[in-house]
Amino acid sequence: MGGTDAKDILGLPKTPLSLTQEKKSRPQKESHRKPDGISREVYALTGGVAPLMPSIDLKRRPPADEKVAWKWLSFTNSARKDDLQLYHWVRVVNDVPPTGDYSFAKYNKSVDILKYTDEEYENHLTDSVWTKEETDQLFEFCQNFDLRFVVIADRFPVSRTVEELKDRYYSVNRALLRARAQSPADVANHPLMKEPYDITRDRERKRALSMVLSQSRHQEKKDAEILAEAKRITEMRLAARRAEEPDVSANENAGLDKADGVVPGRSVSPTSNSQLPATAVAPSTLTMADYASTLASLRMLHVYLRTYGLEQMVQAASSAVGLRTIKRVEQTLQDLGVNLKPKVPTKTVCDEHLELRKEILTLLNLQKQLQYKESEGSSHREGSYAAMPDTPKDRVFAPDPFSFGAERPIKKEQKRKGPGRQADTPSPAHKRPRKLKASDL
């Protein structure tokens, strides 16, 4: 009897009221029918896929305490002298309009032009080519057009070149500074006094610039070929000059040979020379040539990063050595507490860094040569005692009991049998008896 039948007999409801209400309160899940043509296993994998991006609940912005509004307000610009009143939109916070000067008034910059009096002009500024009216008009245009001499030359009533206008303006300023100063030392460091305007140099500069801008493609190609040929000749001369200079490592190697007892007039055994590495016997001419070529190519660039130049010089200096030697140089730098790349790569620091790398490389070459010398000396010592037999000091003399002082009899050499032949031959006890013949009877 099930639970439902017992409830029917007792007259109890099949489902409690609380459970019925709970079922009513729960939302019913939407049932999705499996599409046709898709298996049940595949369709089960499609449900419950995790979202590609995590859902982020955006927090509600708290209500702002400030009340912001945009209003159409009037303003005046301090750069203008006529007190013109204009209008623009302004951001107003809590109904309090902004105060202060116009925000774009700070960009109104003007050039400070020197002013002179009639007395100063008569005493210091008179010129046979320029009149006072022309000079006054020039300074007025310089004030209005902010020293834009191209615009001034276009507006000037008298036909004057840009160079002539510049020369007159700067000469008047220098004369006024010199006349108003109490001593020449007071204005000696002024830019107009230290670097005066040179009209001849300016004309020559513009003439050269116009020639460069007006040349044809054929002339540009020809100039490029000339520059490339000059670069090649410079590199060849520097490489030849570097190759002719004596190497520091070669001089130190020669001094070490003298200290070891090698006389310059005598010849050294070929075995010792063959054992020494090439970097310790002869100077690295190829490395110096690469170093000079790299230096010449960097100079032709005119503008380059100091770290890039240092890397190129280090690669050129390490081109003739192996990777193991380069790692030993870097390890030595780290042991000395020196960075592989300088933190402040000035010219002096880079030169000292390259010099330190050269000295470390020379030290490693000398250590390698010393190691070869020591191995050569040890081999000579071992070879001198190899021909002499060792004295049997610890061996006890035991006479032969069979010889009694005479020579041991030499055993007769037995004939060797092949392997496995003796084992295959049966013993005499196991031999089968020979059959008797008629002649034996």
From Swiss-Prot:
Start-end of Basic residues biased regions: 429-441
Pfam family, one: DMAP1
Record's keyword annotation contains Nucleus: yes
Bias-annotated ranges (Basic and acidic residues): 21-38, 373-383
Keyword Transcription regulation belongs to the record: yes
Keywords, ordered alphabetically: Activator, Chromatin regulator, Nucleus, Transcription, Transcription regulation
GO MF terms held by the record: DNA binding
Subcellular location, record wording: Nucleus
Gene Ontology biological process terms from the UniProt entry: chromatin remodeling; DNA repair; negative regulation of DNA-templated transcription
Domain SANT stretches: 126-175
Region called Disordered, residue ranges: 1-38, 244-277, 373-441
GO CC term (a single one): Swr1 complex
Ranges of biased composition (kind: Polar residues): 268-277
Record's function text: Component of the SWR1 complex which mediates the ATP-dependent exchange of histone H2A for the H2A variant HZT1 leading to transcriptional regulation of selected genes by chromatin remodeling. Component of the NuA4 histone acetyltransferase complex which is involved in transcriptional activation of selected genes principally by acetylation of nucleosomal histone H4 and H2A.
Quaternary structure, from the entry: Component of the SWR1 chromatin-remodeling complex and of the NuA4 histone acetyltransferase complex. Interacts with EAF1A, EAF1B, TAF14 and TAF14B.
Family recorded in the similarity comment: Belongs to the SWC4 family.
Protein's name according to its UniProt entry: SWR1-complex protein 4
Taxonomic placement: Eukaryota, Viridiplantae, Streptophyta, Embryophyta, Tracheophyta
